[in-house]
């Protein structure tokens, strides 16, 4: 006696799935449980068909091969013992009895390869490999034009001239044009302010000279020179650090 597949009903079942509560053949098992990762985690037990010698014996007589299983009596019965027991009265006739196939189920779940995991890993590996972006590749000619342009060279010379002028060590002709253009820009942005006072080092300025005059409004402002004194104007007092 065989157990047929619960899906196709054409082949003999080889595994039993506890989650699906169904017996499946090999083909239907691969089709159902290799579909996704969740289905691949279902516990499946192998089914083994017994030989004639391994067939179970009747629990009543213990001599003949058992063919039925009674759910209420919790016993396997042969044909000769089943008839007199379940035909005795109306209560025993209502017992649920099932055909006994003798198929044994394995004690531990079987290990099956998970094709879905390998496919997912391959897909993940393909997803991680991204093609190089065309926009990230900059032609060498364009990069040379950017870094060797005349404007960048002029700007670097201007900064170099300002640094030398700040430390009072600039040459006579070095960066004069750049310093003049920046001075004009500062005079236009901050009208009435002297650029020499802004570029002069704070340590070289005394307290009396540390006053910047606004020619337009005839107002004087005190600038903090980095010493240990506060220089304020108006209602604030001139006090040293405590």
From Swiss-Prot:
Keywords: Metal-binding, Nucleus, Repeat, Transcription, Transcription regulation, Ubl conjugation, Zinc, Zinc-finger. One of its GO terms (biological process) is positive regulation of photomorphogenesis. The keyword Zinc-finger applies. It holds the Pfam family zf-B_box. A zinc finger (B box-type) spans 5-47, 58-100. Zn(2+) 2 binds at residues 58, 61, 81, 91. Residues 112-153 are annotated as: Disordered. GO terms for molecular function: DNA-binding transcription factor activity; transcription cis-regulatory region binding; zinc ion binding. InterPro entries: B-box_zinc_finger, CONSTANS-like_Bbox1, Znf_B-box. Residues 133-153 have a biased composition (Low complexity). Its main location: nucleus. It comes from the Eukaryota. COP1-mediated ubiquitination and subsequent proteasomal degradation of BBX20 occurs in the dark. GO terms for cellular component: nucleus. Zn(2+) 1 binds at residues 5, 8, 28, 33. It is found in: Nucleus. Acts as a positive regulator of seedling photomorphogenesis. Plays a negative role in brassinosteroid responses. Interacts with MED25 and COP1. This is B-box zinc finger protein 20.
């Amino acid at each position: 006696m065989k157990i047929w597949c619960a899906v196709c009903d054409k082949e003999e079942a080889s595994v039993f799935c506890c989650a699906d509560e169904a017996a499946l053949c090999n083909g239907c098992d691969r089709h159902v449980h290799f579909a996704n990762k969740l289905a691949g985690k279902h516990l499946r037990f192998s089914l083994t068909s017994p030989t004639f010698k391994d067939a179970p014996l009747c629990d009543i007589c213990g001599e003949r091969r058992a063919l039925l299983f009674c759910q209420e009596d919790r016993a396997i019965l042969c044909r000769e013992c089943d008839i007199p027991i379940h035909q005795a009265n109306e209560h025993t006739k209502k017992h649920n009895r099932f055909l006994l196939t003798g198929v044994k189920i394995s004690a531990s779940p079987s290990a099956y390869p998970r094709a879905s995991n390998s496919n997912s890993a391959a897909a993940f590996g393909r997803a991680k490999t991204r093609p190089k972006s065309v926009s990230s590749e900059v032609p060498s000619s364009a990069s040379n034009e950017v870094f060797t342009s005349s404007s960048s060279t002029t700007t670097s010379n201007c900064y170099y001239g300002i640094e030398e002028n700040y430390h009072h060590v600039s040459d006579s002709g070095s960066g004069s044009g750049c310093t003049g253009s920046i001075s004009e820009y500062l005079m236009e942005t901050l009208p009435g302010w002297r650029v020499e006072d802004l570029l002069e080092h704070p340590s070289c300025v005394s307290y009396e000279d540390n006053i910047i005059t606004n020619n337009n409004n005839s107002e004087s402002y005190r600038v903090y020179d980095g010493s240990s004194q506060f220089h304020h104007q108006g209602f604030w007092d001139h006090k040293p650090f405590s």
